C-alpha cells in the first residue's frame, strides 16, 4: 500500500464507495478507509431496506457510477434492479432490493477496477495538511 494519495475517502458506506469510485475513475490515487472489516456501512451492516429511488416520477435522475453499480449488482444476481413501486410520498416510484453479501462483493470488485486501495479496521482521529 502506498503512503501518499491524491484522495483519501473516510467511510466505506454507500456515499464513500461512490466517491472513491469516482475519484479512482478520474485517475486519482485513491485510498478508502473503513472502520469495519467490510464495505457498505448501514446498507450491509444493518437491516436496511432497498436501495433508494433513482427515479423522480417517470424520469431516472440518478445515473453514472451509482447506475453502473446497480447494473453490476443485477449482473451478479445481487439485486432486483429498479422495481416500479407505489409512490405515496412523491419521493420516487422505484426501489432496488439487494443481497448484502453481493453488495460487499460488487463494491470491492468495482473499487479494484478503478484502482482504489482499501484500508479496513481503521479510523481517523486527526488530519494534518
Name each model feature, range by range.
Residues 11-14, 120, 129:
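Glycine-rich phosphate-binding loop of nucleotide-binding enzymes
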Residues 22, 28-29, 35-126:
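Conserved N-terminal/central alpha/beta ligand/cofactor-binding core
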Residues 3-5, 18, 91-93:
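A short, structure-level motif marking secondary-structure boundaries and short turns
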Residues 14-18, 104:
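Short alpha-helical segments and helix-capping/turn motifs at coil-helix boundaries
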Residues 8-10, 19-24, 31, 128:
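Membrane-embedded transmembrane-helix bundle of lipid-linked glycan/lipid transferases
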